[in-house]
Amino acid sequence: MRQALPLVTRQGDRIAIVSGLRTPFARQATAFHGIPAVDLGKMVVGELLARSEIPADAIEQLVFGQVVQMPEAPNIAREIVLGTGMNVHTGAYSVSRACATSFQAVANVAESLMAGTIRAGIAGGADSSSVLPIGVSKALARALVDVNKARTTRQRLTLFSRLRLRDLLPVPPAVAEYSTGLRMGDTAEQMAKTYGITREQQDALAHRSHQRAAQAWAEGKLAEEVMTTYVPPYKNPFAEDNNIRGTSTLADYAKLRPAFDRKHGSVTAANSTPLTDGAAAVILMTESRAKELGLRPLGYLRSYAFTAIDVWQDMLLGPAWSTPLALERAGLTMADLTLFDMHEAFAAQTLANLQLLGSERFAREVLGRAQATGEVDDAKFNVLGGSIAYGHPFAATGARMITQTLHELRRRGGGFGLVTACAAGGLGAAMVLEAE
């Protein structure tokens, strides 16, 4: 094992995660229909600051992400600063690492803290699958540029006359990988077949996720970390995630047809995460700054790791690659963890990663490591459910997982937790958290 890399400032301060908050997560075109991601981001950051009672000018940086970006607000981070009453001099920039975007935002703020350029910052992400950048065809886009440069009406009419009817149809955002043309669900199907993961196993994991998420809400475990929102026409509050199937039975999952490989597949809408709207954010500070402000941190960032692999096969194995690296940098092993939380993009992807984390062969032949990362104890795994139940607003999921894991660690008396996610483009992320 390589030497651990402590995440501390030049003065020896740990990176404290002071608080975290998210909106309820809403299925596409439901509670947040028509609400753009930038407004969701403003909601959560504004409420986070109000609850924390931290002076707005104490926040020196805001790093925020959005995967499905809107052309009219390309820097969502700066719009949030300007729309929440924060100090206009607060530095703000946007990041994107697909489904690991808020992991990246947290890492960036942590690096600024370690460099000593700031003492407090906010990281997070927001996405809306209900407000999408519907585009135009390449032919129409080119014609519009040429028309703008045309000097006469005749030239403009000539340019438009070259267009076909299909060129005028709207173009929705792509759901496939740009480099391969594969959808993430196609990769999930490939991984299910490659690693022998059955439909029954996938449905069982999805059912487990929903049952545990429903139980977490019923026991009041999420109330502190999820805000109540009000959206037009402001008649009813929206306070709880609306994707969770608390009353479903395992038999209900078997009724759905495969969504990607319709003849021989096993990946369905029920054992995959749904398209979702929502936002989440966390406040990070140096440990000494938190003490100055009289704040008790939720916990601390112990380590993080980002990885990248090939996109043609096993593209969603990011957790199996990034987890051992994050553990190594933290100076820990799988046995040291109190909690292990993995983003459930698909049940097939989740089960494949769990399988390979415990595989000696994968460790030796693929990772070049002497031994397996370690089996994940079911009693520590996604104990409050996961993304299949809560939903997955792409850029917000990491911040949800971090906040949720730290609160649960605190309820258990402290310890270490690891959060990890796969992401489009063969990317992976993992972070080790510590609570006292």
Swiss-Prot record:
Signal peptide boundaries: none
Gene Ontology biological process terms from the UniProt entry: fatty acid beta-oxidation
Pfam families in UniProt: Thiolase_C, Thiolase_N
MF GO annotations: acetyl-CoA C-acyltransferase activity
Domain of life where this protein originates: Bacteria
EC number: 2.3.1.16
Active site, renumbered: C99 (acyl-thioester intermediate), H392 (proton acceptor), C422 (proton acceptor)
Reactions it catalyzes: an acyl-CoA + acetyl-CoA = a 3-oxoacyl-CoA + CoA
Cross-referenced InterPro entries: Ac-CoA_C-AcTrfase_FadI, Thiolase, Thiolase-like, Thiolase_acyl_enz_int_AS, Thiolase_AS, Thiolase_C, Thiolase_CS, Thiolase_N
Pathway(s): Lipid metabolism; fatty acid beta-oxidation
Quaternary structure (record): Heterotetramer of two alpha chains (FadJ) and two beta chains (FadI).
NCBIfam families according to UniProt: AcCoA-C-Actrans, FadI, PRK08963.1
Protein name listed in UniProt: 3-ketoacyl-CoA thiolase
